[in-house]
From Swiss-Prot:
<feature type="region of interest" description="Disordered">
    <location>
        <begin position="1"/>
        <end position="71"/>
    </location>
</feature>
<dbReference type="GO" id="GO:0005978">
    <property type="term" value="P:glycogen biosynthetic process"/>
</dbReference>
<feature type="modified residue" description="Phosphoserine">
    <location>
        <position position="86"/>
    </location>
</feature>
<protein>
    <recommendedName>
        <fullName>Protein phosphatase 1 regulatory subunit 3G</fullName>
    </recommendedName>
</protein>
<feature type="compositionally biased region" description="Low complexity">
    <location>
        <begin position="270"/>
        <end position="280"/>
    </location>
</feature>
<feature type="region of interest" description="Disordered">
    <location>
        <begin position="270"/>
        <end position="295"/>
    </location>
</feature>
<dbReference type="GO" id="GO:0045725">
    <property type="term" value="P:positive regulation of glycogen biosynthetic process"/>
</dbReference>
<feature type="domain" description="CBM21">
    <location>
        <begin position="210"/>
        <end position="350"/>
    </location>
</feature>
<feature type="compositionally biased region" description="Low complexity">
    <location>
        <begin position="11"/>
        <end position="29"/>
    </location>
</feature>
<dbReference type="GO" id="GO:0005979">
    <property type="term" value="P:regulation of glycogen biosynthetic process"/>
</dbReference>
<dbReference type="GO" id="GO:0000164">
    <property type="term" value="C:protein phosphatase type 1 complex"/>
</dbReference>
<dbReference type="InterPro" id="IPR005036">
    <property type="entry name" value="CBM21_dom"/>
</dbReference>
<dbReference type="GO" id="GO:0008157">
    <property type="term" value="F:protein phosphatase 1 binding"/>
</dbReference>
<dbReference type="GO" id="GO:0042593">
    <property type="term" value="P:glucose homeostasis"/>
</dbReference>
<dbReference type="InterPro" id="IPR050782">
    <property type="entry name" value="PP1_regulatory_subunit_3"/>
</dbReference>
<dbReference type="InterPro" id="IPR038175">
    <property type="entry name" value="CBM21_dom_sf"/>
</dbReference>
<keyword id="KW-0597">Phosphoprotein</keyword>
Amino acid sequence: MEPIGARLSLEAPGPAPFREAPPAEELPAPVVPCVQGGGDGGGASETPSPDAQLGDRPLSPKEEAAPQEQEELLECRRRCRARSFSLPADPILQAAKFLQQQQQQAVALGGEGAEDAQLGPGGCCAKCKKRVQFADTLGLSLASVKHFSEAEEPQVPPAVLSRLRSFPMRAEDLEQLGGLLAAAAVAAPLSAPPSRLRPLFQLPGPSAAAERLQRQRVCLERVQCSTASGAEVKGSGRVLSCPGPRAVTVRYTFTEWRSFLDVPAELQPEPLEPQQPEAPSGASEPGSGDAKKEPGAECFHFSLCLPPGLQPEDEEDADERGVAVHFAVCYRCAQGEYWDNNAGANYTLRYARPADAL
């Protein structure tokens, strides 16, 4: 009778029954050789385990595909684990979470068409693509203010400044420039000179001014329009000084006395002139007494400001528009009030073209 161990070792291995492969999580058990003694106790034999025998034979296609399916299933489970969002609810985060869930479902189903349907041509879902976000909803400021110091001057490179400098002109360039300017001056049409304020009165001479000063104690002697447009009128004259408070005022109008303005004049003492030596013959020259200034007289100066709209736009009908400025001089002192109004006609200035342009 043969020993049981020898009978097991000599038994021809037959085809093992089909069984499913162990799961991927479980590692295969190591092959342990089986050592059994013979009937006489002196012999020893190593018998491979059934798992080792299964490893020696070729696997069927179904058995080879089983471990691969297990690995794919585990990988899918890992991908399906959603990331936790600890931040507060936000539309952008919700949209990102929704997109991640759609991608995970598409991977789990293994369908590429589902992912294409959820994603637009730009790689984002239609819900995220049409969403508008404002800075205040994200906790940001709607406006940013930047302060600049006046002391911070920009550092301009010298190469940039060199481009702004004019190139040195040659003699030929200057000659050509002079010819071009002369041609332009000839080709330009001569425009009519602008109209100016012209006095419509005649100021008295020295003798008449002295006589008027003695008669009415105030006399206008000079009028001048300082600018071409006549926006300012300056004048001067003399008054007889008297004790007590005194003041000179110029009243003028440019609305034909529908309204008027009073401008105070500045009073100054009349400067003293050096006495001229007497003629050796003892006879005075004719008219020399007219130039003598009255003793105790004071000079006054005034300035009238006019609005800019008085000058006519059309130079041709400047004389017909009737734009005029009327004024008179008033002298107030302790003895009373005195006027110099051009013998009741007032001093009048009117816009007119120069005489040489007519």
